[in-house]
Amino acid sequence: MDKIKVFFRRVASGSFKRFFRNLELVHEESGKNRIVLFVDMVYSMFRYGIGYLDYMTFGFAYIKRDKRLTFMTMDDNIAMVRRLNQRDSYEVFDDKSVLYRKFKDLLKRPYVDLRDGFEGFAAFMEGRENFFAKEPVSYGGLGVKKVTVDGRDAKEIYEELMEEKLFLAEETIVQHPEMKKLCSSSVNTVRVCTVVSDNGNPHVVYALVRIGSGDKAVDNISSGGMYTLLSKDGQITHPAFCDKTVTYYTEHPATGFKLIGFQIPYFEEAIALCKQAALREPTMRYIGWDIAITENGPVMVEGNNLPGYDMPQNHRFHDDGRGIKEDFEYAISH
């Protein structure tokens, strides 16, 4: 009975319209009968605990029970967060002002909290043509604004940002020229998911690169960007997926730049930075780190205490049709 309630709650939360839209997309991609797919989607909810979005992302239309059991589900992910991350430490990652203080040396760029007063902001502004302002608590690329000084008075900008509650001002990250080839209008970040084992060892479970769409200054998936899984040595080996267009790209749609074979600069250093960061807050053992790559190496953008489980399990990134649940289990136990 509980699973029936969960099923209808999840369908209703995304709307029946979206449910059938996804059903149609899976039908078009797989060529399978709509009724068969509908029944299997409902069955998968009860048997494996996945919603219709994950059904499409994981490619469940193409695989059977043994491989379906290798996937991390939403419930698995929530259970892992509850097990590995202590709620009273969430603020470290929910509030960027707290995060920035904790990991200041890994940010590797100056920033200022406007709530500390105008004088600090005025000093930060000296000689700057632009910078980024952020809400301390915001998600998905929202609450972020690129500020162009353009001769304006520092006091005017300060009051404007205070009014908009964009309390954090930080130096604009200038990404590595190679990373700029992916998309020049946004800083294209690497998402590195770390798990600290029961023995205190940091492990990288997966790494993704997120690429801007070309018309916004952020690379977030919710803002129209795309993503793809990286190989162990930091290469793009599979097409990038865009949720907004429900399309896989081997070339960037705005520039035509070929994605397959691209090597992330300073990838080893980025992994080392994330492992270092993973050990800094012992009560938060499961974190997704957003890393930017500059000419001088990797810098931290932010950390997330609810890392995604779905993106790294996109079926187009795994030729063997398997999920990464075993990778998480290994990381926890070793």
Describe each model-derived feature in a short phrase.
Residues 1-54, 196-232, 299:
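Internal hydrophobic scaffold segments of catalytic domains
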Residues 10-123, 274:
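Conserved N-proximal alpha/beta basic substrate-recognition cap immediately N-terminal to
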Residues 17, 249-275, 279-286, 293-334:
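C-terminal active-site "lid" helix and adjoining low-complexity regulatory extension at the edge
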Residues 79-199:
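Active-site nucleotide/adenylate-binding loops and adjacent lid/helix of ATP-dependent enzymes
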Residues 128-130, 187-191, 204, 286-288, ...:
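Extracellular structured ligand-interaction cores
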Residues 137, 171-173, 194-196, 211, ...:
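Short, flexible loop/turn elements at secondary-structure junctions
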Residues 140-143, 201, 215, 310:
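Short catalytic/ligand-binding loop motif for oxyanion handling, primarily in non-cytosolic enzymes
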Residues 183, 187-270:
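ATP-dependent carboxylate/phosphate-activation module, predominantly the ATP-grasp catalytic core
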